[in-house]
Amino acid sequence: MSVSIVMAEIPPGYYDGTDGLDGEELRLALHEIIDNHTVHSYSSLWTHFQSTDKKPNNKVWDMYSDIPNGTPPYEYTFVSDQCGNYGGESDCYNREHSWPKSWFNNASPMNTDLFHLVPTDGYVNGMRSNYPYGEVENTTWTSQNGSKRGTMNSYNFNGTVFEPIDEYKGDFARTYFYMSTRYTTEDSGWDENDMVNGADLKEWAVAMLLDWHQADPVSEKELNRNDAVYDIQGNRNPFIDYPVWSECIWDECESTGGNVPPIANAGPDQSVGENEIVYLDGTGSSDEENADLTFMWTAPEGILLNDPTNVSPSFSSPMVENSEEFIFINLLN
């Protein structure tokens, strides 16, 4: 039996044309890159979720019920647990527009864009309603995983909000940065409400989402989901690929030399035997501005890298029942 080691990378040249840009110029350049994605039907989302939101145990990855590194109060099986009707939490899962569809009048292509559509518990989805995300000060309702609804009084905003758990706040922040970029200049007729004006985020929302983005960095889950959605829609979430771009657009770039992202090289795909020592190879990575590179390799569950911050870490190939494929990602800063 063999183990296939596959290196996930951003398609070469995908972000050409972004060199040296920041602010609104960068946002518009990214808009042109991720615009005009392949649009799928609303009913097809049930099938696509099986590629984009599957846990390692093959259950539905529901961010409104999951407890990372813990035991979720309940889990859903794809297809058989689709809503339907529900009378309470843990009955079934449905399709959550994290950017509520009423904010864009349920128009296409936003209503089926997988970058903001995720499977969630139907009842919790209903309790979230179309309230903005925020940080609850006075709680009126709490889900079984700790997501909550209530009133917010911070970031110069006071009103009813829905707060996901800390472990997924960065995910939703990067989703909102994507939506604000993908649909800028295409938001005619969109809603203005407490959090957004069309596709533009209001000042308090930018401040909060940047804090969420920084406190909950990009995870392996997001990296894998970004690749899965790219395979389906043909576009990517730039703020997962290059997290610094959120600051470059809505705040300030940390680098004084521009915002040209480093080029990651993860080495070739490999096919190895069980229990072999395998070396990853990031030596071909480079930075146009000659900045020092910080490596962070992400490995699939069950594989322990000897040093994930090394340019070329190693690991022992796992024992497998059948030939299996494992995806590794080289994330550079």
Model-based region annotation:
Residues 259-263, 313:
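Proline-centered linker/hinge motifs at extracellular inter-domain junctions
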Residues 83-256:
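Domain-level detector of nuclease and nuclease-like folds
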